A protein has these predicted regions:
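NTP-dependent small-molecule kinase module
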Residues: 90, 97-157
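A glycine- and Lys/Arg-enriched "phosphate-lid" helix/loop adjacent to the NTP-binding pocket
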Residues: 2-28, 38-90, 137-144
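Functionally constrained cores in energy, signaling, and assembly domains
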Residues: 43-46, 57, 95, 118, ...
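Arginine/glycine-rich "motif VI" loop of SF2 helicases in the C-terminal RecA-like domain
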Residues: 37-41, 98-101
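Conserved alpha-helical scaffold flanking the Walker A/P-loop in AAA+ ATPase domains
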Residues: 29-37, 93-96
Length: 157
């Protein structure tokens, strides 16, 4: 599981030669290429965007500010970043659209109600595991005889 905070990405200082008008197109292409490589190697990728509404984000921020045990989760900069809500939503939409593939799909999960979010994410993971069609390997007759022999030897010692 990887968790990325957008404000950290934005604050990232990029070397000047990397900054071009095509930087995001190039990065999205690289993300798709890396994910394509990983899925060819057998890695299962499921990307989940937890979509918290602006109203719910505000409510959670106020709860954090009222509760001393939760204040560490809040940054004063969060208030400034909320002013750019539309820009963040547009950036998320662009990134998700540009990097979703059959092999590495995005799932956008409503996240205002934590119980529902957890249930939806659990179902996505269960479905991904089911798709692996995992099963206990069948033992050949020779392997079964070897195990039986090993069992007899263990009992004798």
């Amino acid at each position: 599981m990887t968790r990325v905070h957008p404000e950290l990405l934005e604050a990232q200082q990029l070397p000047k030669p990397l900054v071009s008008k095509h930087i995001w197109r190039d990065r999205f292409e690289d993300i798709r290429a890396i994910e394509r490589y990983l899925t060819r190697q057998g890695t299962v990728i499921r990307k989940i965007f937890l979509n918290v509404s602006k109203a719910e984000q505000r409510r959670r921020f106020l709860v954090r500010l009222r509760n001393p045990a939760k204040r560490w989760k809040f940054s004063v900069n969060d208030v400034n970043e909320r002013l750019r809500w539309k820009q963040y939503m547009a950036a998320y939409e662009e990134a998700i659209s540009a990097t979703t593939t059959v092999e590495a799909p995005w799932y956008i999960v409503p996240a205002d109600n934590k119980w529902f979010t957890r249930l939806a994410v659990a179902q996505i993971l269960i479905d991904a595991l089911d798709d692996l069609n995992l099963h206990v390997p069948e033992l050949s007759c020779r392997e079964q005889r070897a195990l039986h022999h090993a069992q007899r030897r263990l009992r004798a010692t």
